[in-house]
A protein has these predicted regions:
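Outer-membrane beta-barrel translocator/channel fold
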Residues: 128-199, 259-272, 277, 295-310, ...
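Repeated loop/turn-to-beta-strand initiation elements of outer-membrane beta-barrel proteins
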Residues: 118-122, 156-160, 212-219, 249-257, ...
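Residues that define the transmembrane beta-barrel architecture of outer-membrane proteins
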Residues: 90-92, 104-106, 140-144, 195-201, ...
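Gram-negative outer-membrane beta-barrel transporters
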Residues: 407-475, 504
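Outer-membrane beta-barrel translocator/receptor signature
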Residues: 78, 87-134, 138-146
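Residues on the lipid-exposed face of transmembrane beta-strands in outer-membrane beta-barrel proteins
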Residues: 110-114, 123, 148-152, 203-209, ...
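Outer-membrane beta-barrel "beta-signal"
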Residues: 505, 528-541
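Outer membrane beta-barrel strand-and-loop segments of large Gram-negative receptors
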Residues: 352-354, 366, 375-422, 438-440, ...
Length: 541
């Protein structure tokens, strides 16, 4: 049907198309352009204005109280990145270190450890010995110690324990360095006649909070027991204890109580017993730039209490550049066989236990200037029973008597450390002590001046470590010939060390002590060892 309509339209329109082709061309005008023209008009300016606002609203003042809004946020979704991570460094729990020394020496260290989520245990042992008997008769000594230790975590509590044994063997070899002015003959002695040993067994346990608790209280309780004996029938056993309880206030201030004390029993030809206790409550106020801690130390003595002030003020004068600290404190300590033989092993071990009341006024400063990190300190110390050491009169084998005296000491210390080039750093320390002794002419065998300096280099890959250190000790007074004051020759010791790591497990070291060969004595007639090379290897596993 649609096709029929199209065909019919075609036939009807054809005659008109044919007739149009017969029209003359001059009869048709084609208009190509058409322009619209407006009548002349006059331009008028018009300024728009906003309509007048009709409203009865007046300005209002609102006071809104600040109120924190508790908003719970869902934990962020952590998605792993498609990046290759560097493998973490392997942690080794055990090591073995062995080395040889001259003259005729050996050193060995071993450590074995294991840890889990709620405990850690370990064992360590150390042995060192030197024998210069071929040069100086009986100049030889050795040291051996071993320790078992561990920590157990149970809830918010950490329990630490330690059990150890140590033995030190030495000889009173100073007889061969005596001079004729001592009116003592120089005699050869078999080793067993000048032999001394100190054997000690110790055990300790401590309890502390391993994490923050709801009461905002931190605490630590510690106790230690030891038994010490020597080769001359001296025996000592002691029990020490200490604790610290701190209550935090407003997250920054604190009230704390510290206590520490000990009880000792010494046996030789007679028994001696001595105990002491320090109890120190204090309050600490902390501000953004300063801290003040004030309290007092109560010391029971003869049925009464001695009271020492305890004050510490710390202030940041220049952020990181200068921090100063001033304070005063006092406490009681004890001089016993253990502390005396650790300081001077060449004493005559028939001693007197002695309490020592120590009072200290101090000022400190530390910080950094550019690359330099520094620290300075000055102390004015009074001690009621500072141990001094002089030779036993008329004893052919040199041993030292212990003398207690009231001594006032002014001690000045300055130290610093600074990198001078990449991987190269310089460090140093200077200490000066001036003694004012009540009943003696000098602080016998106490060091007056100490000087330390060091240069350390570490390679970029951390495999090479090289260092050189200088130690100097001087102004050590002694009683010459039993009648006059004199000073020991200065001790000057230069040491160098080189350590190289072949792999994460294996490294080696070489260390040379006393490169200058300075044998000057720390204790009268007990000349030190000369040049002491040490070569060794360390393996981690």
């Amino acid at each position: 049907m649609a096709y029929n309509k199209i065909i019919s339209f075609f036939f009807f329109s054809t005659p008109f198309m044919v007739n149009a082709q017969t029209l003359p061309t001059e009869k048709v005008d084609v208009i190509k352009d058409f322009e619209v023209r407006l009548k002349d008009s006059e331009k008028k300016d018009f300024q728009a204005e906003l309509p007048v606002i009709k409203s009865s609203i007046v300005p209002q003042t609102y006071n809104v109280s600040a109120k924190p809004i508790q908003v719970s946020y869902a934990p962020p979704a952590i998605r792993p990145l498609a990046l290759k991570k560097d493998p973490s460094a392997t942690i080794y729990n055990s090591f073995l270190k062995i080395g040889g020394m001259l003259p005729a020496g050996f050193e060995g260290n071993i450590g074995i450890g294991k840890s889990a989520e709620n405990y850690s245990i370990g064992f360590s042992a150390h042995h060192a010995q030197l024998n210069n008997d071929s040069k100086f008769e009986n100049q030889k000594n050795s040291w051996t110690e071993g320790h078992l230790f561990g920590t157990y975590y149970t809830g918010p509590i950490a329990i630490k324990g330690q059990l150890g044994y140590a033995i030190e063997r030495l000889h009173y070899y100073g007889y061969q360095f005596r001079t004729t002015e001592d009116s003592a003959s120089i005699t050869n002695f078999p080793s067993e006649q000048v032999f001394q040993s100190f054997q000690s067994l110790n055990a300790s346990i401590s309890v502390s909070n391993a994490k923050e608790n709801d009461l905002k209280v931190d605490y630590t309780l510690h106790t230690n027991f030891y038994h010490l004996k020597d080769n001359y029938a001296a025996r000592e056993q002691g029990l020490s204890f200490a604790g610290h309880i701190e209550k935090w206030i407003a997250e920054k201030h604190s009230v704390d109580v510290q206590f520490e004390g000990a009880t000792n029993q010494y046996r030789d030809t007679a028994d001696q017993n001595l105990s002491y206790l320090n109890l120190t409550p204090s309050f600490a106020f902390r501000h953004q730039i300063f801290k003040v801690k004030a309290g007092a130390n109560f010391v029971p003595a003869n049925g009464e209490f001695k009271i020492y002030p305890s004050l510490n003020i710390t202030s940041q004068i220049i952020p990181k550049g200068l921090i100063i600290e001033i304070g005063v404190d006092g406490k009681r300590t004890m001089e016993n066989l253990k502390s005396l033989t650790q300081f001077n092993p060449f004493i005559k071990t028939r001693i007197q236990l002695q309490p020592n009341d120590r009072f200290n006024v101090y000022a400190k400063a530390h910080g950094s200037i550019g690359k330099l990190t520094y620290e300075g300190e000055i102390n004015y110390i009074t001690e009621s029973a500072l141990p001094l050491f002089n030779l036993v009169a008329g004893d052919v084998i040199p041993r030292f008597n212990v003398q207690f005296d009231t001594v006032k000491t002014i001690a000045i210390m300055v130290s610093g450390k600074m990198p001078i080039k990449e991987n190269l750093s310089l460090s140093g320390k200077f200490i000066s002590r001036t003694f004012d002794v009540s009943n003696n002419d000098a602080a016998w065998h106490r060091i007056g001046v100490e000087l330390e300096g060091g240069l350390t280099y570490t390679s970029n890959n951390q495999k090479l470590l090289a260092s050189i250190f200088l130690n100097q000790y001087s102004r050590i007074a002694y009683l010459k010939g039993g009648i006059e004051k004199a000073f020991l020759l200065p001790i000057l010791e230069l040491s160098a060390q080189l350590e190289y790591q072949f792999s994460p497990r294996i490294s080696s070291y070489i260390k040379v002590n006393n490169l200058t060969g300075n044998e000057n004595a720390r204790w009268l007639y007990y000349n030190r060892y000369g040049i002491n090379p040490n070569l060794g290897l360390q393996v981690k596993f």
